[in-house]
């Protein structure tokens, strides 16, 4: 029991550290790009162009996006994370679909997503406007009037993770 508790605590610390590393990468990207936030596209544009902060779309199926590390290590934030795919995942997340387990998979490559209000959502946010009337889309670092009240990354539940664009429908 003591070892299990220590392991759980270590996984939590590693998960928080990964979120911090992604946050730092996100800030550095903006600093190198005239304060513009990294793109944060939805499913269709991610699949079509693969030019967003993370280039994979997670599913419960056997699609290559679930395991192909290139979709992470070649994405827009990759050079800011030393192309380390591990920072995109909470180490405690071992959830797989029955189909994935039957194929012998040990894990999927990502469990973290980005707030849909942060970055250009591409076709999701035409003209830089939020897809939700009355809500702000943050495109540059200077757009945040109260940055302490905004989350950027979160460890998303395996049942809902797909693209890198996390939204709670207002």
Enumerate the language-model features and the residues they cover:
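Amphipathic alpha-helical segments typified by the pilin-like N-terminal helix
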Residues: 1-17
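Short, well-structured segments within or immediately adjacent to enzyme catalytic domains
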Residues: 15-170
């Amino acid at each position: 029991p003591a070892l299990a508790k220590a392991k759980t605590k270590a996984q939590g610390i590693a998960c928080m550290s990964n979120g911090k590393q992604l946050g730092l990468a996100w800030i550095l990207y903006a600093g190198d790009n005239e304060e513009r936030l990294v793109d944060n596209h939805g499913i269709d544009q991610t699949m079509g162009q693969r030019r967003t902060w993370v280039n994979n779309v997670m599913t419960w199926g056997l699609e290559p996006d679930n395991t192909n590390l290139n979709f992470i290590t070649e994405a827009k934030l990759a050079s800011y994370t030393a192309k380390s795919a591990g920072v995109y995942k909470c180490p405690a997340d071992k959830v797989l679909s029955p189909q994935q387990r039957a194929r012998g998979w040990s894990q999927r490559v990502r469990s973290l997503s980005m707030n849909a209000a942060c970055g250009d959502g591409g076709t999701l946010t035409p003209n830089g406007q939020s897809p939700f009337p009355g809500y702000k889309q943050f495109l540059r670092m200077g757009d945040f009037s109260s940055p302490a009240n905004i989350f950027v990354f979160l460890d998303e539940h395996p049942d809902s993770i797909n693209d890198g664009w996390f939204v709670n429908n207002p």
